[in-house]
Amino acid sequence: MANEIPDLECQVRAGTGKGAARAARRANLVPGVVFGGDADPLAIQIPYNVLLKRLKAGRFKSTLFNLKVEGHDDVRVICRDVQRDVVKDLPTHFDLMRLRRTSKINLFIPVEFINEEECVGLKRGGVLTVVRAEVELVVTAGDIPEKLTVDLTGKAIGDVIHISDVTLPEGSKPTIDRDFVIANISAPSGLKSADDEAEGEDAEEAAAE
């Protein structure tokens, strides 16, 4: 299922080189360039506040965007670099790369948990503890999944859900090789306390013997 790709609206930048870049910054714009995809590089610029907001939101360099530039066809891009001022740590330039539908990219995909009402552990008062709300996958640009689905049907207290338990979209794989944890069904705090007390009593009895 294709994800809804966010738009990134930029403007064509008049001229290239340091002079044009400085002129853009004086106008409160951040200069950039989009390259790749069997097309010539295109000098672009984006309002400073717009880029800063995107950067603060996170995942800017791992989000697929639909680049919209007046006078040019929309194209899918991903950020390859954001240069920053060494003193102020604020963006001074950015690079975007055009993608083909067959391009492989790393993206964070959200995880959705379904059938909570069929989860035995939750019915008994257990708590769903989400370790990873997103998972970074290597995906194909033309077939980006909207989400990963975890079915909680039949899960009991103490069950741990690993990435190997999740059906991944065809052609995608995690960026991490190990079988990491997505979530678990933990015991309610009251039950944990009772178990801890019982374990403590058992230990005391064993010591007395």
UniProtKB/Swiss-Prot annotation:
Q: Which UniProt keywords apply?
A: Ribonucleoprotein, Ribosomal protein, RNA-binding, rRNA-binding
Q: Which gene encodes it?
A: rplY
One Pfam family, short name: Ribosomal_TL5_C
Q: Which organism is it from?
A: Ruegeria sp. (strain TM1040) (Silicibacter sp.)
Q: Which CDD domains match?
A: Ribosomal_L25_TL5_CTC (cd00495)
Describe, as the record does, how this protein assembles with itself and its partners: Part of the 50S ribosomal subunit; part of the 5S rRNA/L5/L18/L25 subcomplex. Contacts the 5S rRNA. Binds to the 5S rRNA independently of L5 and L18.
Provide ranges: composition bias, Acidic residues.
196-209
Cellular component GO terms, alphabetical: cytosolic large ribosomal subunit
Entry function: This is one of the proteins that binds to the 5S RNA in the ribosome where it forms part of the central protuberance.
Top-level lineage group: Bacteria
Please list the GO terms describing molecular function: 5S rRNA binding; structural constituent of ribosome
Q: Which residues form the signal peptide?
A: none
Q: What is this protein called?
A: Large ribosomal subunit protein bL25
User: Which family is this protein grouped under?
Assistant: Belongs to the bacterial ribosomal protein bL25 family. CTC subfamily.
Query: Which GO BP terms apply?
Result: translation
Question: What HAMAP family would the database entry show?
Answer: Ribosomal_bL25_CTC
State the residue spans of region: Disordered.
Answer: 190-209
- Which InterPro entries does its entry note? Rbsml_bL25/Gln-tRNA_synth_N, Ribosomal_bL25/Gln-tRNA_synth, Ribosomal_bL25_b-dom, Ribosomal_bL25_C, Ribosomal_bL25_long, Ribosomal_L25_dom, Ribosomal_uL5_bac-type
Q: Which cysteines are joined by disulfide bonds?
A: none
